[in-house]
Amino acid sequence: MNPSNLEPGLANDSRLLVAAFYAFTPLDDERRETLLSSLPTLARNGSVLGSVLVAHEGVNGTISGPESAVDAVLDHLRTSFDLGDEHYARLEVKRSWAEKPVFRRFKARRKKEIVTIGVASVDPSTSVGTYVEAEHWNALVDDPDTLVIDTRNSYETAIGTFEGAIDPSTESFRDFPQWAESTLRPLIEQKSSKRIAMFCTGGIRCEKASSYLQQQGFGEVHHLRGGILKYLEQVPEAESRWQGECFVFDQRVALNHQLEPGEHSLCHACGLPVSAQQRELPSYIKGVQCLHCVDRFSDADRERFAMRQRQIDQRQIEQHKINRQQG
């Protein structure tokens, strides 16, 4: 993290709320543009950092900052939506805490989809699978007639997943429909499974994945409401079926069962998570290469990465000196 990029007033805060959220609720052009203009102002006034995607189908984001300021952004979103009694009409929020900023800036971006599956007919506001609360998840996945599917990408599943879950080994969520047709459908026929149980980080990908499977006649489809993050928040570790850490899309990289930063860090060359043990390998050079990308880049690339890392290290040293002088 580059401390010089942090918003004023955040650098010394010791406890920041991190809120991951989404809502599938229709937004017309006017309401979408209003959000795109109002959110940055509200975030700046409250020292809130993060990223929010805004589309005609709804919003998807993760933000961090002082609790009252984050709650003000969430309340603003709620009042901007037509939240009724339909299954999709809610702002799904997962809360965790951080000791330092996990984003460098705030961005609100206009998108075609808030999570991209690339199938125009998929609409969670029309059809989704059966929601499963975290407290009931263990009973569902323990049933031998349940086929458990991890809808996340391979770099996420590599550092943690639920016991017995099937890994589609996808590089992008766009790959899920093709995997479902080429691999999942034959697998269901082979195993004679009675139901599918799906999960993802916060629940949003399962909204679209379950909608797709419902459309394509895959039978009984269930998905974990609130995703892995809600499960880790509500289920005691002693009763948990979760193994490993949960990858998150901010500077914490991965969370353990206590929703605290885990042992993984990002390789800034390739952007993939690297465990503490993997950082001890001879192939690992901080900021330059890891076991995932040791043969991926040219010597010129690695020299450029090394120069960038030296600049980052120097800025951190300078910031540390400033903090000591101010302290």
Curated annotation (Swiss-Prot):
Q: Which UniProt keywords apply?
A: Oxidoreductase, tRNA processing
User: What is the enzyme's main class?
Assistant: oxidoreductase
Native source organism of the sequence: Synechococcus sp. (strain CC9605)
Recorded superkingdom:
Bacteria
This entry's Enzyme Commission designation comes to 1.14.-.-
Q: What is this protein called?
A: tRNA uridine(34) hydroxylase
Catalytic site: 200
Protein family per UniProt: Belongs to the TrhO family.
- Entries under CDD domains matching the protein: RHOD_YceA
Concerning InterPro entries, the annotation shows: Rhodanese-like_dom (IPR001763), Rhodanese-like_dom_sf (IPR036873), TrhO (IPR020936), TRHO_N (IPR040503)
UniProt GO BP: tRNA modification
Q: What reaction gets catalysed by this protein?
A: uridine(34) in tRNA + AH2 + O2 = 5-hydroxyuridine(34) in tRNA + A + H2O
Q: What does this protein do?
A: Catalyzes oxygen-dependent 5-hydroxyuridine (ho5U) modification at position 34 in tRNAs.
Q: Name one GO molecular function term.
A: oxidoreductase activity, acting on paired donors, with incorporation or reduction of molecular oxygen
Q: PANTHER family annotated for this entry?
A: RHODANESE-LIKE DOMAIN-CONTAINING PROTEIN 7-RELATED (PTHR43268:SF3), THIOSULFATE SULFURTRANSFERASE/RHODANESE-LIKE DOMAIN-CONTAINING PROTEIN 2 (PTHR43268)
SMART domains, per database record:
RHOD (SM00450)
Which cysteine pairs make disulfide bonds?
Answer: none
Record Pfam families: Rhodanese (PF00581), UPF0176_N (PF17773)
Q: What positions does the domain Rhodanese occupy?
A: 142-240
